[in-house]
UniProtKB/Swiss-Prot annotation:
An example molecular function term from Gene Ontology annotations: RNA binding
CDD domains registered for this protein in UniProt: rho_factor_C
Residue ranges of domain Rho RNA-BD in the record: 107-182
Annotated spans, Disordered: 1-60
Binding site for ATP: 226-231, 238-243, 269
UniProt keyword annotation of Transcription present: yes
Organism of origin: Akkermansia muciniphila (strain ATCC BAA-835 / DSM 22959 / JCM 33894 / BCRC 81048 / CCUG 64013 / CIP 107961 / Muc)
Summary of the function given for this chain in its UniProt record: Facilitates transcription termination by a mechanism that involves Rho binding to the nascent RNA, activation of Rho's RNA-dependent ATPase activity, and release of the mRNA from the DNA template.
Protein's recorded name: Transcription termination factor Rho
Amino acid sequence: MTEELDNTPSPAGDIPQETLPKPLPAPEETAGEQPAAAPEENRGNAVREEEEAAPVLEQIDINELRKRPLNDLQEMAEGLPIRNAASLTKSQLVFELGKQLLAKGHEVVVSGVMEQAKDNYAMLRDPVKSFRTSPDDIYLGGNLIKPLHLRVGQQIKVRLRKLRPHDKYLSAASVISVEDIPAEDYRARSDFERLTPLFPKERLLLENKGVNSAAMRVLDLMTPFGKGQRGLIVAPPRGGKTVLLKTIARSIRANYPEVELIVLLLDERPEEVTDFEETVDAPVFASTFDEPSRRHAQVSDLVIERAKRLVEMGRDVVILLDSLTRLARGYNANQTGGRIMSGGLGSNALEKPRKFFSAARNVEEGGSLTIIATCLVDTESRMDEVIFEEFKGTGNLEIRLDRELSERRIYPAISLSQSGTRNDDRLYNEQEFVKIMQLRRQLAMKPGWEGLQTLLQNISKTQNNAELLLTGLR
């Protein structure tokens, strides 16, 4: 019936418009009152108002919490249900704060260096703590590792999830970035072992007016450094190796700020570690002499893996290691089983130190890894002698420090006749190489300490090595 009425033509067209009933006027709106909305509109408005009223919780970075002093963290914990906050260590307090912030709905992120724990999971360690195990380390599950083909030593940033009742660590929910590349754009690189090794070709000049120029100028003339060098600083006790290594670090940082410089100190005195951290603008990873040997092995493993990942990215990396002897001692003490060889070394004790040192190389695909390591001699230890003999022929650069020169207070105490670089002609241009060979022949005609003293006197009279090579020895 309704359809029939709707389809019937309206008679309004035949009736004058003025005779039609006028529409009722709209009701007047009372001032200050809004017209009533439909129930659906009311519900929609209410939802929008709730969304607008909901507070936006700020993103929290665990790395920023780690930088803050303990007093600040304790103040943050005052309004949170954290038991005995005043008695917790800084790392424990960071863990508890992260746990509470996640429970409140904050987005919590953190970055760290990946260390493989077992086949199905890994941990993100804090580089600032030299990769020491800590309560605020981050658990990284296999479900995040396998899809992206993540590797040990990579810098990874993750987003954390709320903790479950039996969780012992803060746990990653998703990967945000790998080596500062967004996770969705990241692609696995060629493995370090598959890259093509080459001779060092590009020079690392150490001469710099801002540091001990004399020592660095001697090294540039007698033992030139190249990117991808594998060098040994062979030193007796109190021969000045630590000071020389520190000066090399400062020169590289001043001349090549783009180079990834890493300092690794093993079995070292705590005050020496602090001195390096304060005077060298580079990450310092250390394991002091009061820590167990397995700790020496752990930090060295992570440092070399971190360096390999950087080389895979095409970076130039320099590792300064003090010392290779202590690294070998640490692996030897950490070894279980096997035969005992000469000097008390285990049959397989030098396998990992050898792999560490042999990783130094220039790479055809781009990037390089340079390792300059100190090696102890004249310590009256048979083990140290065996370690030195094992590594003696593996490097392509050797700097020999002389005890007689150091006793005469001649620094740097470098033995000119016993120091040198293999294939150094690749690092000099032709004219420079001719001048260098003339200089070395002149110095070789003098006794050891007289030759070095003559060179240092000529260095003090010239502004730079270029001037010295042009004028010759005086």
